[in-house]
Amino acid sequence: MSDDIRNLVYKYALHNAYTHNGKANVNAVVSKIFAERPELRSKAKDIVEIAKELVNYVNSLDVESQKKELESKFPEMLEEKKREKESKKELPDIPVSGVLVTRFAPNPDGPLHLGNARAAIISHEYARIYNGKFILRFDDTDPKTKKPIPEAYDWIKEDLKWLGIKWDLEVRASARLETYYNFARILLSKGYAYIDLCKEAEFKERRSKREACPHRETSPESNLELFEKMIHGEFEEGKAVVRLKTDLKLPDPSQRDWVLLRVINVKKSPHPIEGDKYWVWPTYNFASAIDDYDLGVTHIFRGKEHAVNAEKQKWIYNYMGWKYPYVREFGRLKLEGFMMSKSKIRTVVEKGVGIDDPRLPTLAGLRRRGILSDTIKEIIITVGLKETDATISFDNLASTNRKKLDKIAKRLMFVGSPKEFIIDIPQPILAKIPYHPSNPNEYREISVNPGDIILINENDAKDKVLRLMELCNVTVNGDKLVYNSKGIEDAKKLGMKIIQWVKKDESVPVVVLSPDPEKGIETINGVGESEIRNLNKGEIVQFIRYGFVKVDEKSADGQVTVIFSHE
């Protein structure tokens, strides 16, 4: 083997070792070589042997020696590493004093989707970066309007685990009502809150005129008595609320004396976990403010639609003499072409569509479709903390996913709309087909004999000459594929299309489900090579010249159903 080829192998062996803590990998090195010099694939066996030899040598060096070799012989590879580091997307630095504590507070009234997963990923990532704590807090204190779904607690936890998110503490707000009552008593006793007995319409009219409710000046003692009557069920729903005293001259009416707690008729609207145990429930802003303080949250990352909520909650913090957490708010994140509204997704799910329907932008739907968790995280980190709304096209999502799958997914042969042909070859041929182009040493063998029936796509059959991948070159003649030659060089000279094929007597029936958010799910029937039979449910592979698919179901009769991810 020439010196320039040995130098090429040595260069990539050094670079791979230096970027992986001093240990190079033969397969990774060979993959880089074939990517740069594809013509060397014909000498794969020799290349692999040289790679093994030089990788062993490089791995015997310490990291500092590897770096010196790169600096002296291949300095451009160090520059490449520097560029890779600079191009890696990271979250911006934030001010931290002491132990950083973040939280993710989903309402378990539906599944997570790409948009609301953003707060979870960013909050967890900052906790990881700064060696802090991450809290999962279920915001489930509205059993009427945003009623929690019992299954949603587990849906959310399953999605977070899939994303690689681990929480240090799990909290359910509905289990903390006594805590909220105690803080309400403090606010009432200090005159910062009051019990409003006005009708809602009457209060709204007064608020619009910036006029005080007649109950605003009720004594703390009387308010505390009324509050005890509220929590003991002596007031019907809509008859009494606890309001925080703010500024009636504030320009935003919603911030004027907003509601801390209200009566909810849990006989009609029982909580899925607490049932009808509690009669008085905190609003989102009251429960969030109390929990963020009580649980020691120092940093909050959330959508900019919560900006008004922050202003409301600061009133409580100021009254109590607490320091408000550091807050960063970001814009909405949408997946183009998909319904992103939680309420709309919930409506669809309630009609019997599973949360993992591959047409939905739910994390469960994307997962079932073959989108990797690392892809979701990379997209979120790349968008970062931008305050402007962002829309991600599915093509962009697929592009990121493809780069990751390309490195790991097996390449297998599937034929849609198959057409039968008898192969006319002079003698048996043993095809050795690599599972992945980066590793020619791992392959499956398919033995083809003269007269075997071969299945190819009906559109491919329209060409006069073809190359059956890793088998031979053929001429299409009626219902026969007539042997032309064996080598790939002949195919290149004649510009032959290189196609996938399946041997009929070893074929596996395959159903491809191709989801479209608007058109529904298209079903494509075809056949696959025998290796598809050995795939596990949930495994993602690439069907050659077709796209990436994820195994969804394996039937007792041998049929394999897959979901099309993307090209």
Swiss-Prot record:
NCBIfam families: gltX_arch, PRK04156.1. It catalyses: tRNA(Glu) + L-glutamate + ATP = L-glutamyl-tRNA(Glu) + AMP + diphosphate. One of its GO terms (biological process) is amide biosynthetic process. Keywords: Aminoacyl-tRNA synthetase, ATP-binding, Cytoplasm, Ligase, Nucleotide-binding, Protein biosynthesis. The keyword Coiled coil does not apply. Disulfide bonds: none annotated. One of its GO terms (molecular function) is glutamate-tRNA ligase activity. SUPFAM superfamilies: Nucleotidylyl transferase, Ribosomal protein L25-like. The keyword Metal-binding does not apply. This is Glutamate--tRNA ligase. A motif ('HIGH' region) lies at residues 106-116. It is found in: Cytoplasm. Gene3D superfamilies: 2.40.240.100, HUPs, Ribosomal Protein L25, Chain P. It comes from Sulfolobus acidocaldarius (strain ATCC 33909 / DSM 639 / JCM 8929 / NBRC 15157 / NCIMB 11770). Catalyzes the attachment of glutamate to tRNA(Glu) in a two-step reaction: glutamate is first activated by ATP to form Glu-AMP and then transferred to the acceptor end of tRNA(Glu). Its EC number is 6.1.1.17. Belongs to the class-I aminoacyl-tRNA synthetase family. Glutamate--tRNA ligase type 2 subfamily. One of its GO terms (cellular component) is cytosol.
